Amino acid sequence: MPKKVIYTREEIIEKAYEMLKSEGLNQITARTLAKKLKTSPAPIYGHFDSMEVLKDELVKKAREQFLNYIIKNYTEKPFLNAGMGFVIFAREESELFRAVFLMGNSDKEIILEFKDVIFSEVEKDERFKKVEEEKKEWLFNKCWTYTHGLATLTAMGWEKNNSNDGIKNNLLDLIVFFNDVFEK
């Protein structure tokens, strides 16, 4: 008779997610997770075919949290909010940021989701409505590159000016640089 499962799938995901946030994705193994749950690895494998399946669930959950950050209103400027959310996520949830963007778990889908959020937000800005689609794509790609770089530096602890105002000023520098896109 098989042993009764003592942890639900959701409980295992929650404990693993706590580990992800504090220790990072690479620290999550069946053995380390079982130790945190005060059990053997058997209950984990009772719900997940492999640790990779569990880790995929964790990255999916981290991506959802990332998307929540980029839709918040940090300023009165919709275009700035998504970028600020990106960098604030990297600052506040550096291990989640690393799991989503720096460990090979990032794919085109998350970039497209981010792009969709940005485009829906910036459409609220009257100036953006005048910009041609080709320029919008160009602007998005440049902003993505800059913001992803700033977020990475922040998550790694290399960007020292990472207060909300510091992030805002860094991103405003980029917006000022690209301001001519809106003016043409």
Predicted regions and their residues:
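Append "Primarily bacterial transcriptional regulators
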Residues: 28-35, 44
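Amphipathic alpha-helical linker/stalk segments
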Residues: 56, 60-82, 118-128
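Amphipathic C-terminal alpha-helical segment
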Residues: 96-100, 144-162, 176-184
